[in-house]
Amino acid sequence: VFHGGVAGLKQQVEATVNLLTTDGRTPQKQLDDIRLHLHPQLKKQNTEFQEVLQPLLRQQGICILDYIELNQQQRNYLDNYFQEQIFPVLTPLAVDPSHPFPHISNLSLNLAVVVKNPDTEEEFFARVKVPQVLPRFLPLPPELRTEDNGKTANWSGIPLEQAIAHNLESLFPGMSIQEYHPFRITRDADLELEEDEAEDLLLAIEQELRKRGMGGTPVRLEIRSQTPESIRSRLLQDLGLTENDIYEVDGLLGLRDLMYFLLLPLPDLKDPPRQSVVPSRLQRLKEPCINPDVPEPEDGKDFFSVIREKDLLVHHPYQSFSGTVVRFITSAAHDPNVLAMKMTLYRTSGDSPIVNALIAAAENGKQVSVLVELKARFDEENNIYWA
């Protein structure tokens, strides 16, 4: 919502646009209502994680620790890991009159650091970006994992930013680390397009995508509630934000990174994968079937005979997409009686069987026309490639 909706509302407020919504709210009123409802939701979200989800994870042997909870052996291991794997990819940037505030990329995790020169007592502000090329959570080896009731944990480790924070002396040799505070910003990701004026829409979108890659206007600052006023005001000033744009998060920033734990080989903690079914009317067709679970008898009907007899309504994801829609497109691509294929693509994956079938249809001499929606939000680059 912040990438697009909130960013758009902020632009309307700055442009003094006071158009009312159907329920009579101005852009400013909508922003106020978003903040009013979102702050308690964020607080509840972090409370649920810390007081409910984390204890449940611990019961299952998944221990997300704080650095201060580690014993000396565990600290030594992670400190060595920092020196060998993390330190080489870090680039701390000081901010002073000769070094302007660095560009903060969208949704990147950062540390605001205050260091002091022990000789001059002068303090400096610096920013350390938590590298996105490394896992957000650093695991301990099995022999160092936390034990509970004599059982070794399935996973033990700490967030990456804590390993960095407790080794800041390596990044600022000769300086005294005064304080550090994590923060994250969200930038406007909407494309500013004047479609009526654009001679080439595809080229215009490509240009806007390059701008978005450099980063749109900041619209939100996420910090901890303990972040002091001096750091808050510094970040707000350099990012061009106001107090209303601050969202306090007491806990992990960027909870979506917890998806990391879904990759752990613990099948008992996961729902069994849902097996989509193929409608019975499509289970005995002549054409080769993409779904290997469907038999391919030679005496079956072809796809078009089935739908010619009666319309077929399918429900996804309960019924197989590959065994219905993909099979339909693939059948058409290879059917000599099909002369032309026309369809619209809004979002599709990089290895889409739909696209492969359309390419095969064109190679088979059929007339293929595809309308690709270039403005599918956050899929623009992918759709430009297919277009």
UniProtKB/Swiss-Prot annotation:
One GO cellular component term: polyphosphate kinase complex
Q: What residues does Mg(2+) bind to? A: 347, 377
Q: Does the keyword Translocase apply?
A: no
Q: What class of enzyme is it?
A: transferase
Catalytic activity, reaction form: [phosphate](n) + ATP = [phosphate](n+1) + ADP
What InterPro entries has UniProt attached to this entry?
PP_kinase (IPR003414), PP_kinase_C_1 (IPR041108), PP_kinase_middle (IPR024953), PP_kinase_middle_dom_sf (IPR036830), PPK_N_dom (IPR025198), PPK_N_dom_sf (IPR036832)
- EC code: 2.7.4.1
The cofactor(s) it depends on are: Mg(2+)
Q: Sorted alphabetically, which keywords does the UniProt record give?
A: ATP-binding, Kinase, Magnesium, Metal-binding, Nucleotide-binding, Phosphoprotein, Transferase
**Coiled coil regions, renumbered to chain:** none
- The keyword Magnesium is assigned to this record: yes
Stored Pfam families: PP_kinase (PF02503), PP_kinase_C_1 (PF17941), PP_kinase_N (PF13089)
- What are the recorded Gene Ontology BP terms? polyphosphate biosynthetic process
What role does this protein play?
Catalyzes the reversible transfer of the terminal phosphate of ATP to form a long-chain polyphosphate (polyP).
- Protein family: Belongs to the polyphosphate kinase 1 (PPK1) family.
Question: What is this protein called in UniProt?
Answer: Polyphosphate kinase
**What's the source species for this entry?**
Aphanizomenon baltica
Q: Which gene encodes it?
A: ppk
